[in-house]
A protein has these predicted regions:
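Single conserved hydrophobic/aromatic residue that forms the stacking wall/gate
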Residues: 1-6, 10
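Glycine-rich beta-alpha junction loops
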Residues: 4, 37, 56-58
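A glycine-rich helix N-cap at a beta->alpha junction
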Residues: 12-35
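Amphipathic alpha-helical segments that form well-ordered structural scaffolds
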Residues: 14-18, 118, 179
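Short, conserved loop-to-beta-strand elements that form functional interface hotspots
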Residues: 29-39, 163-165, 188
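A domain-level signal for the structural core that forms small-molecule/cofactor-binding pockets
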Residues: 39-40, 71-72, 79, 177, ...
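Glycine-rich phosphate/nucleotide-binding loop
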Residues: 42-141, 148-149
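Internal helix-turn-beta structural module
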Residues: 104-110, 125-188
Length: 189
């Protein structure tokens, strides 16, 4: 089928000519497998590999894995065009269910980490492209603030349900963002 034909072309025209020797030197192996086998390997695995997928397969499987091993709200995505354009985004989409609750005036505990990291990725890239190191430094500090806030036990509901930290403080969306801001302010001082 299409997948095995595409893999054969890749192996002959790209891998064998450009990467086979480099992989061998580094003790890395390349192999093609069908998506069902790849999924089974991932579920049993502890990592240590790169999994290249076609767009749809990669989209669905990365969402599945992020959810299975933590929270979809912790995963970002970067789209890179052949023309050198970059788009940073939260991989989870719009979280409509929470948005509709918000419209009704109901409190939500939506995890904004993926959206924050989409912004930090874009800021870091912009700083790189325009040679403005301060943008990258700010992005690094904001990401550090997110991590420290969670490590200090302040988190949204999705993380509070899976954390191993004792007595996590479950925050609504706005309070979590305020906590990240307070941590960022202390890091920037």
């Amino acid at each position: 089928g299409y997948s095995s034909a595409a893999s054969d072309v890749y192996k002959r025209q790209i891998y064998d000519k450009e990467y086979a020797d480099k992989f061998k030197e580094l003790g890395i192996e390349y192999f093609y497998t069908l998506i069902d086998d790849a999924v089974a390997r991932v579920i049993r695995s502890e990592g240590g590999y790169i999994w290249a997928c076609k767009n749809y397969d990669g989209d669905v499987m990365s969402d599945l894995l992020a959810t299975a091993f933590g929270s979809l709200s912790m995963m970002t995505s970067v789209l890179v065009s052949p023309h050198g354009y970059f788009e940073y985004e939260a991989a989870h989409g719009t979280v409509q269910r929470h948005y509709y609750k918000h419209l009704k005036g109901e409190e939500t505990s939506t995890n904004p980490i993926a959206t924050i990291y989409a912004w930090t990725g874009a800021l870091r890239k912009r700083g790189e492209l325009d040679n403005i190191p301060a943008l990258g430094e700010f992005a690094d500090k904001l990401e550090e603030a997110c991590i420290k806030t969670i490590e200090n036990g302040e988190m949204t509901k999705d993380l509070a349900l899976i954390t191993t930290l004792p007595n996590p403080k479950t925050l609504n969306t706005q309070d979590f963002i305020k906590a990240v801001r307070a941590t960022l302010d202390s890091l920037m001082a």
